[in-house]
């Protein structure tokens, strides 16, 4: 399975769970980036190599990954999965969204999504797929 096939599966599964999904294909690598609920929930990096140090994605699914499952950098946490761990990734993403809805309340969560939709220039580059 390659990155495009993995992205297709994730988009299908996450859209069935009610996520709003934006996708960006990297220009210089085969990496694909998904933003969920306008970035309010989290981002997912789908790749076959280590990520750049200056970027941070909460969830990373990396083909053939062999390293720490959890990393911490500058008070940020990142989770790493192999392509075979897609079910666990989806469960963890759902849990992340549920934690944020509990913290902010559903109405505020939706309000924050709307604010990001209107004001974040990132979503001019990311294509909405769902």
Task: Identify the residue ranges that each predicted region occupies.
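Negatively charged, low-complexity tracts enriched in Asp/Glu with abundant Ser/Thr
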Residues: 1-39, 69-77, 83, 95-130
